[in-house]
Amino acid sequence: LKNILLPTDFSDNSWNAIKYAISLYKEEKCVFYILNTYTPTIAHSRFMAISDHEKMSKDIVRANSEKGLMNLVWKIKSKYKNEHHSFVTISSFNLLVDEVKNIIETKEIDLVVAGTKGASQIEEVFMGSNIVRMIKSIKNCPVLAIPSNFKFKRPSEIAFATDFNRFYTESELRPLIEMARSFQATIRIVHVQYEIKALTEVQQFNLGMLRKYLGTLPHYVHTVSELNSVSKTLEVFANELDIHLLAMLHYPHSYMEKMTREPIVNRLAFHTQIPLLVIPELGMNASCYSVKKETSENPSRTLKK
């Protein structure tokens, strides 16, 4: 049983991410937690009394949130009739990232799947501010970011971007390995270098351990020269090899951190055209995945906060 968190702002982009997640796990038993957060714009100091009008405003926004979630579940069930899937809706008066982190802990979430941009995000940015904050803040769960117009493709070609400067633990690689096994995928290990040169002893050791963890999974190593920026280089690589999903770890000085810090002019062309799986840094003893009890329950309810 997998627990998948689907944040939504009811935009087309978030709907596309939901469709991707449901298609990705159509053969697996899953509970999908669909989250909508709302924070009404109320201009008052935290020390001032809240007027009846402000309370009414919050009630209206909460009602709209709950109604939107109810309609969304109806839409999903009408389009995807899958007995393996159940849905729990969560309407919360909270900041999105704070609520996502809370739900990951309390619901033992395996994966967060979210759209790259919200309802008001412009197209020219690398990723929307919410998804970037989510990736930077979440320390114990992978995040799968889905582009606005990406149509689901079975991820049979997965790229894993790494510079081999860091030792990866088995727990950190587990989301990548499980994804590859589920879809009999080939893993393309891609190393972007500013100028091509031989690997250091440390890099060779880390590559050897990476290959050991991947075991019998088909995988290849590709070393490519940087083109203007890491993001542009990975985009070209993904297009040329018809990559269906790009995975990377997020830690200090990682490719993911470099991409979010690149000057905007270097990121204009990178529209996250394929799904991006971002795995958090866990260390030696941590794990994204908790042991869960199998249950025959079929939760379909709305949680209020």
Label each PLM-derived region with a short phrase.
Residues 74-112, 215-266, 274, 283-293, ...:
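Structural beta-alpha unit
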Residues 1-55, 157-223, 243, 271, ...:
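Small/aliphatic-rich secondary-structure junction motif
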Residues 110-137:
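Helix-enriched interaction subdomains in cytosolic or periplasmic regions
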Residues 131-151:
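Short, structured interface segments
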Residues 116, 191, 249-251, 280-281:
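Short secondary-structure boundary segments
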Residues 127-131, 203-207, 260-265:
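Charged helix-capping and loop-helix junction motifs
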Residues 53-67:
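A short acidic, glycine-rich active-site loop
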Residues 113-116, 142-148, 276-280:
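Short beta-strand elements of ligand-binding domains
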